[in-house]
Amino acid sequence: MAPYRIVFIRHGESVYNEENRFCGWHDADLSGQGITEAKQAGQLLRQNHFTFDIAYTSVLKRAIKTLNFVLDELDLNWIPVTKTWRLNERMYGALQGLNKSETAAKHGEEQVKIWRRAYDIPPPPVDISDPRFPGNEPKYALLDSSCIPRTECLKDTVQRVLPFWFDTISASIKRREQVLIVAHGNSLRALIKYLDNTSDSDIVELNIPTGIPLVYELDANLKPTKHYYLADEATVAAAIARVANQGKKK
């Protein structure tokens, strides 16, 4: 076995996922299917004899609740949990709340794919007077206004997430703590891009399914030696296809 191991889980399906809407920093709840996925993720971890010493998640309820369901299945409700805005989903700007298929019909699938997946092209920003601007929410009241995005591309998300990896998560791993991260499609893509040294162009094609644990085994320098999902290939492929198809016209 590799010296270190970390487990990533994208939150279970949210109400906005179910409705095929851009979610971002909007605090959407889990759907019924999302609750089932979260519980199943915990069951998969238990069946494969995983345990954890510490967990990290975002400040968005779909990730927090997923983590809670997972820990409940593992009987690990007592372990320390750190919630941070740095693990939040990418902020989708003026796209937040819009239906992805309707947006693709209006602007074209290729433009929506660029907005969803391009590394360095953000969607149009929200105005600070817009109710969708996170700075209007109490949970960010103590956060410096310069840190609160009006929109983000994946490059921005990487720059937000990686300091938390270097300052906090990697230190936990090196202390030989068993670490669980429950976050979002794009904050996890940011971490995986760094770990796998994925190019800016290749990251466009990476899709992470909801609710399936992703295990990374790391060497002494925290470089990946192996990674795998705790599910069979057909299940993972079908789940990834569902994510990839979200930005297409119906």
UniProtKB/Swiss-Prot annotation:
(2R)-2,3-bisphosphoglycerate binds at residues 10-11, 17, 24, 62, 89, 92, 100, 116-117, 184-186. Ubiquitously expressed with the highest expression in the sub-tegumental muscle layer (at protein level). Expressed in the tegument (at protein level). The active site is at 11 (tele-phosphohistidine intermediate), 89 (proton donor/acceptor). Keywords: Glycolysis, Isomerase. SMART domains: PGAM (SM00855). Pfam families: His_Phos_1 (PF00300). Strongly activated by 2,3-bisphosphoglycerate (2,3-BPG). Inhibited by vanadate in a dose-dependent manner. It catalyses: (2R)-2-phosphoglycerate = (2R)-3-phosphoglycerate. Catalyzes interconversion of 3- and 2-phosphoglycerate with 2,3-bisphosphoglycerate (2,3-BPG) as the primer of the reaction. Schistosomula have significant surface phosphoglycerate mutase activity also without 2,3-BPG. Binds human plasminogen and enhances its conversion to active thrombolytic plasmin in the presence of human tissue plasminogen activator (tPA) in vitro. Host-interactive surface protein, which may degrade vascular blood clots surrounding the worm in vivo and thus may help survival of the parasite in its host microenvironment. This is 2,3-bisphosphoglycerate-dependent phosphoglycerate mutase. It comes from Schistosoma mansoni (Blood fluke). The lineage of its organism: Eukaryota, Metazoa, Spiralia, Lophotrochozoa, Platyhelminthes.
